[in-house]
Amino acid sequence: MTFSIAELFEQHSTDKFDLHERHLNNQMVRMLKTIGYDRHYQRAVGQYLYDQAGTEYLDLLSGFGVFAIGRNHPTVINALKETLTLELPNLVQLDVSILSGLLAKELLETTPDNLDKMFFCNSGTESVEAAIKFARYTTKREKIVFCEHGYHGLTMGALSLNGEEIFREGFGPLVPGCSPIPFNDLEALEKALSNKDVAAFIVEPVQGKGVNVPDDNYLPEVERLCKKYGTLFVADEVQTGLGRTGKFWAIDHWNVKPDMICMAKALSGGFVPVGAVAMTHKIMDSVFNRMDRAVVHGSTFAKNNLAMAAGLATLHVMEEEKLVENSLKTGTDIINSLNALSGKYEFLKEARGKGMMIAIEFQSPKSLTLKAAWAMLEAANKGLFCQMITIPLFKEHHILTQ
């Protein structure tokens, strides 16, 4: 009897919600059904999803930043098919692979020139976990400083650096020595670092939650202060990297040189998870400092051939299709066009962001009638007004966003 994924899809095309309710997270199913997002998607191409009726949906969530080159890009599909047909030796744990070496070389050509070593893992949160360990070992310090409202993942170490209480609630005690400070606040940062006992300061160049863009002097001063107090500067580019902000790395907007860059999401091409940390030679040599420490940190499936092939193909597509340049131009046009409407609509405060990493912020209107409606919604649930926009966008205009 042959095994066929296509047959499984055909047999169970309408079973996914029932299967998840029975065997997975039933609260996710309840939420989707409650807000009317319970669609049976059958196909995905580029930025579009298609349901059973052939209805086209514009996916602005992009898998939370995964699909920088669109869904099911043929170049990545062909690279994965070719990798499978070659019958390559994979995950030979007492060996090193060609593809991981090539991907490391390609990535390091895009990073600041002080970074010349790569560590591969399977996800963004794993890259943050690695950065925590590497920073502590290299500096011989325990403390990690992070930003309020920041997001770095949900595994225990990364969760300890999560600036949103809803994710942390009930999972303590978390990793000790992790302290939050306000984002874009240099005075708070210097105060936190001044005792010279902080291993690393980790920050998203543009915060993913809310798309908060720092002042132009912020990251250059972060770099200076970290050097002054012997703290490693870690840029979390899991959300912002690979062209999303209109530069290959968001840090390129400010020409800073962190000690480590965490990356993942878009590097996968939307297929095989891959995460990585770019770092200085000094950090790599400090952690992996003897032959008996050659495997002191790692992951079983890191550097697997499919993940590395997906990463190489993704970088090729980004260069060939000039996606970074397109992100800058298109994003600037969108932000400017939306801000031009702010005088026309009372609720619209501003559109902000970098490249195609964009947020629209709403505000309390001035007219009494609308102001009362706003106050009522805010009192009921602080995020309710935005839901009243995103749900009709989905149901009436077939746009998926949050």
Predicted regions located by residue number:
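Conserved N-terminal phosphate-binding loop of PLP-dependent enzymes in the Aspartate aminotransferase
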Residues: 2-402
